[in-house]
Amino acid sequence: MIGPFKKVLVITSFNEKLYNEYAHRFLKTYNWPFDLKIYSEKKFNITYKDYKVIELGQDSKDFVQRNKNRPVKDFWVDGVRFSYKVYSVIESGLQAINENTYDILIWVDADSVFHNPLTLDFIKEHIYKEDSMMTYLGRGGMYSECGFLSWNLKHKDTKNYFEDMKKMYNEDLLYKEKEYHDSYIWDLIRIKFEKEYNTKNINIGDQAKGHVQARSVLGEIYDHVKGPRRKLQGFSAESKHFNLNLKGRK
């Protein structure tokens, strides 16, 4: 018996433009033995295998419509750009909890390339604890790296966490904060739960700046090829586990 969890759901989000740019590598290398759901602001056809795109619901569309004309100087204040990810997690997470279909929800950014399968043993050792709500990659004094996030869907606080995140976006409350991108808001609500409800969470980051995923235990499993430079070279030079140039993958 690996643990009290049985079913794991992995989700990501990308549109057709991003699929053609890099997310096709995500799908072609995805080798985890868990269900994968893909969300997007608009449905489009994926010819690889039998993957289907789930169109995000009305809450996401309404948020974008209300806020699409806000001035954006940099990504720290781009609430719309990262809202698709947030609504993907909220929709899939609440559905899984309400329908009791999955025990663990994992988010992985679409600019990722997979090397080794993620096993239940690995999850038990590094990602999951029965008394913890979520797992994240902490970077010390700055916002977390949220290209990977995981939630224990059986934890008593997880549904309320999703509902609080939903409120931040449905009521545009994120625009009252110092930064509007998703990493800042995920952290904001997580810290609130830790302080107000003594919620336990798992930090698998090394508390240092930079590409924390590549340096973490997750670097053994997959490569988050984040940023223009890494996408151009096709891999993360920071990874101590892999020295693979994936630029040739189409």
Predicted regions: what they are:
Residues V10, V89, L149, W186-I189:
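A residue-level signal for conserved active-site and pocket-lining positions in enzyme catalytic cores
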Residues H24, S83-Y87, Y180-L188:
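A structural signal for well-ordered alpha-helical segments within the folded catalytic domains
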Residues S83-T135:
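GT-A fold catalytic core of metal-dependent nucleotide-sugar glycosyltransferases
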Residues H155-K250:
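Catalytic core and acceptor-binding pocket of nucleotide-sugar-dependent glycosyltransferases
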